[in-house]
Amino acid sequence: RSSAASDVYKRQYNISSQIFFKMLDNKDIIPCCTGMIQKEVAERIAAGPGSKTYGILSVLIQAWYKVEYLFTVSEHVFNPPPKVKSAVIRMTRNDTQELGCDEKLFKQVVKTTFNQRRKTLRNSIKPILGKECPLTEDTLFNKRPEQLSVEEFIDLTNKVEIALKEMNLQP
C-alpha cells in the first residue's frame, strides 16, 4: 500500500476552495491532483503575479504544486447544463520540501495581505506588525500583494519574522 494519494474528481463547485486548503494540509501524501472545477476557481489557482485573479489560492497552491490549466469545459456538455463553465486543472507536487520560511507565518502573511489587496504591503501588513511597522522603508513594501511571486512572499515572510523577533513578538 502506497503512502501517497492522488485525486481525480469533479466536486461540488461551492466547496472547491475548502478542498484545496485541505489538500495543502495533506500535501505530503498528495503528489498529484487532477480535477474539473469552476472555471473561475481554476483561473485563480493557475494565475500568475500581476493578474487580477492572482490571490491567496494561487500563492499557497503554487508554493507546493506546479499548476496546469488543461482545458475549459462548456456548460452545454452537461445535462442539465450548469450556469457556469468548468475547467480541468492538474496540480503536480513540486520538489519543494521546505519553503525557506515559517510555513504558518507564510500563510498568515499571504492571507493578511490579500485581504487588503488594493493596499500596498506597507499598509496591508500592519495587522501582523502593528502600526509602527519597522520594515516600511524596504522597497518591497511599495508593492501590492498581487505583484509578488511566491518567492517574494517567502522573502516577505522572512522579513516579517525578523521584524517580529526584533519587536519581541512571536510569529
Kindly give the residue locations of the regions a language model identified.
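Class I S-adenosyl-L-methionine
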Residues: I15-L148, D155, E161-P171
